[in-house]
Amino acid sequence: MIDPRRLRILRAAADHRTVTAAAAALYLTPSAVSQQLAALEQETGHTLLTRSGRGVRLTAAGEILLEHANAMLAQLERAEAELAAYAGGSAGEVTVAAFATGIAEVLAPAIVTLGVRRPGVRVRVRDAEGDASLPMVLDGEADVALAVEYRGAPREGDRRLVRVPLYAEPFDAVLHAGHPLAAEPEVALLSLADSDWIGPYPGNPCLDMVLLACELAGFDPRLRHSSDDFRAVVALAGAGAGVALVPRSALRGMEVRDVVVRPVTGPAAFRRVFAAVRRGAEDHPLIRPVLDALGDAAAGLSTREG
């Protein structure tokens, strides 16, 4: 009988591509991971991993086993959910990994809702920017991920996860108060073609989305300054260093000086926010209320955004 715990370790090794990284994700030592993988190979009678440079990759046998492992682990998630429901599991902790703006916009309101609706459900929050939240869910470090997908940089579907769409939000133009277009009620993206731009660093999907929107508008933005921190981007715009596109929710509650924020016309720049859980866990009696509360908070946000 194959030990499911070893299948989780195999999946982590395949995802992270090094034993050291897999061990860190699972809070194990590299030697413990190596021992468990060796035991799994002995159980199956096949070599499952092979060295590839400084990392590891699955063999053909490993690929076959991983496909079945994903299905098996999803079924175990369903079994745990049904057992928890049978036992009347109405109290417990759910760990949610989320990006900062998502915490402020939907997770914090969801926690308030849960405090009234399901006081037995305790939410533990982990700040996870960029792509970090989804691997945390897959590795079992978190139960729910709150993540984003940008236009121009769609995420590949992962059958191990169930995604729950929450809301889409536009990016607004941030201009210095003295910019020639500052008095306009809205700004055509093409009209910013001659401005200096402030944007994220290469590799940030937000930058890919900005570049695509500008390309569709008919120009390549002249990127002069780079920061992945929206507060820094807005501060630079306030200093007259350039213009930027910033998610609307990131601007809410932010202290802005010497800048104006305007809706953009032309090719749309937007991002989609979604929750994700391990397949089979979506109806767990502790996780389902969290997803429902996130959905309620997002519906209110969509109303405000119009």
What are these regions (language model features)?
Residues G157-F171, L175-W197:
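Flexible hinge/capping segments at coil-to-helix
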Residues R155-P165, E169, R231-G280:
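Beta-alpha-beta core module
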Residues V19, E41-L58, E63:
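A short LG(V/I)-centered, amphipathic sequence patch enriched
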Residues R11-T29, S34:
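Short helix-boundary/capping micro-motifs
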Residues G102, E129-A142, V148, Y201-V260:
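Hydrophobic hinge/microswitch elements
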Residues V106, V259-R304:
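A late-sequence structural motif
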Residues A91-P154:
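Central regulatory/effector-binding core of bacterial HTH transcription factors
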Residues V148, L181, P185, S195-A217, ...:
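Secondary-structure junction motif
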